[in-house]
């Protein structure tokens, strides 16, 4: 079967799409990755046929969330459908925020599967509003808060449904929308919060790693600093809202504590560095394999990579889902979050010292990582095959949360 995997250019969405495409290709499918032009060279070097997602140029209307999600998707959908039809695509896997893929599937009349590269953010009658990272209310005040947040979320859902219907109408799609054959939640089961209304045809498939640095030309690795002191891995956030100052605060903390530091970046680092620090472009996996602690912004990609390896984290969330992720990790005992406006070298130093010195953080991270031991890209690819086979029915996957709701 020829399957297109469609995702926008943001690393947190493009990389899981590439990982899934690699697994589908490994299972004998013909794949086509459609994403931002900046990733095409790495995808092609990785042996993945790739084309650019149409009409990605910045638009002033992007400031309006409804347009950014649905209006732009409506403009992209028809040229995307023509592009995929010409390529002989028989099914689509579409990133959850790249709605153009879903619209294109409707226009083409082909089945599609939704890829969600983070914990499920669906409305639930048993949880506060998704994305807030709040614990379920335990008393009349917090239960009232939850009810108010759910009401606000329902209002937002109604508005979103109206905007989506309007966008579809502009494409001539006035009949009932073709829902996805299934949904893949690419997170660790331990990162999910148990809910009483887990949606049907939605399965947790585990994180899906893909690193473009694996396919760069020349040296692929940042050299590790000499010595045997614990190594702190610092990841610059790739999210538009990512916090700044992570590297600077981490350098001071490591100097104070006598630790080593390594940080992988997309670009070379300007300026002098002490001998116990190494910063530059390179693959993340070798550096993570030697690390004791991760400092990151709380984006799901790095969060999952750290947990899979049992690494505790200092999280400085910059916005969006990062706050939710940071709070979930804190409740699980696997991270120490610091809000960006409260970040200081003193707080960073104290947090890193605790993460390195207290084994409970690492044990908590290992417990979370173990929940995805048998999951990952190949499992996700098998689920895509099952979702696209009408003779098979996917049963809901039970969620055994390790995070207090």
Model-derived segments and their meaning:
Residues 32-69:
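Conserved nucleotide-sugar phosphate-binding/catalytic loop shared by glycosyltransferases and other
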Residues 177, 347-405:
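C-terminal amphipathic helix plus adjacent low-complexity
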Residues 190-293:
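Donor-nucleotide binding loops and adjacent catalytic segments primarily
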Residues 92-95, 281-328:
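A donor-sugar binding/catalytic signature common to diverse glycosyltransferases
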Residues 71-143, 190-192:
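Conserved nucleotide-sugar donor-interacting segment of glycosyltransferase catalytic cores
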Residues 6-19, 241:
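A short, glycine/small-residue-rich beta-strand->loop->alpha-helix junction that serves as a flexible
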Residues 157-207:
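Long, low-complexity segments enriched in small/aliphatic residues
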